[in-house]
Amino acid sequence: VSGTGAAGECRPSLARGLWALTYRELKKWLKDPVTLVMFVLQPLIWMGLLGKSLNIGGLFSANIISLPPQVPIPGDAILHPPGLQGVVLNGEALARMFADMGPGIMKGAFGVADYFSFMAVGIVSMIVVTTTMFSGMSIVWDRRLGFLDKVMSTPVSRAAIIFAKILNATLRAMFQATVILALAYLLGLQLSPTFTPLNLLGVYAAIFLLSVGLSSIFIAFSIRSTRIERPMHFVGLITMPLMFSSNAFFPTRLMPSWMQAVASVNPLTYLTDAIRQLTILPLDATALLWDFTYLGLFAAALATIGIVLSWRCLTR
C-alpha cells in the first residue's frame, strides 16, 4: 500500500493498480478466441495473398521479358567500334541478361532482392499502428458500461488507469508483431546476415516507443467519447494516410518530392526503417540511431500531451 487516508482506507500503490487494470485488459483479450484468431488471420491474409501476389521481382524473369528472337540495333546507337551499319542481338540472350540484372535492380530500389521481405516488415508496422489505436478504444466501452466510473470511485490512482491502457496497447502490439514476424519467416522472409536474436530487443524497443506515443494521444481522444463510432472513424481516417505516406510498402526515395516531405515526418517511416535495419537490411548504425532518436522524441511529445489531457479529463 502507498498510504492510509483519514478514514483509515488503504490506498493501493500505483504499481498494484497498474497491474490489476492491465491484467484485466489482457485477460479479456486472451479469453476471446475469436479476436485472437482474427488478429492472426488478418496479417496472414495480407502476407499470404497480397505479399505473395505482388511478386515485383518476377517482372525481371526471362519468362516475363518478351523480346523478339532477333533485336536489331541501328548503327547510330553503336559507339564502338565506329562505322558499323548495325548489329543484331539474340533476343533470348538479351532477356536472360535483363533477368540477371533483376536482383540488383530490386536491391537498389527496395534494399532487398525480394519484395515479400520488404512488404512483410511494412505489415508489421501497419498492424502495430492499428492494434495500438484499437486497444485504446476499450476505454469508450469502460465509460459506457460504467466500469470507468466504478474504478474512479475507488482509491486507485488516476495515473494507473491511463498507464494501464497504454501498457495494454503496447503489450498487444509487441505480441502481434512477434506473431507476424514468425509467420513471415515461415512464408519466406529473408533475414539479413547481420541479424541476431538480440536484434529483436531493438525491434521491441522501436515498437514500444511508437505504441506509447500513439496510444497516449488516442486514449486522450477516446476518453471523452461515449460513442464507439467516433474513435472508429478517427482510426479509419488516419490509418491509411499513415501507412501510404510512409515507407511501409514503397521506398520513400521513389515517391514524389512532396510525399517524401510528408514521409520524413511520419513516425511510421522511422519505425519501419528501424525494423528493416534490425531484420532484413545490413545494419546502418547511423540510420538506426536517427530512427530511435525520432521515435523517442515522438513518444515523449505525444505521451506527455496525451497523458496530461487524459489526466485532466479524469480529475475534473
Locations of regions flagged by a protein language model:
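Junction motif at the cytosolic side of a transmembrane helix
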Residues: 2-3, 57, 279-283, 292-316
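Short, membrane-interfacial amphipathic segments enriched in basic
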Residues: 2-23, 214, 258-269
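Membrane-interface helix starts
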Residues: 23-42, 289, 315-316
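Hydrophobic alpha-helical transmembrane segments of multi-pass membrane transport/permease proteins
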Residues: 31-59, 96, 117-131, 176, ...
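Transmembrane helix segments
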Residues: 48-60, 222-265, 269
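Hydrophobic alpha-helical transmembrane segments of multi-pass membrane transport proteins
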Residues: 72-99, 108-187, 218-219, 237, ...
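Membrane-interfacial helix-loop-helix junctions in multi-pass membrane proteins
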Residues: 85, 103-114, 194, 243-301
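Alpha-helical transmembrane segments and their short interhelical loops
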Residues: 158-235, 285-307
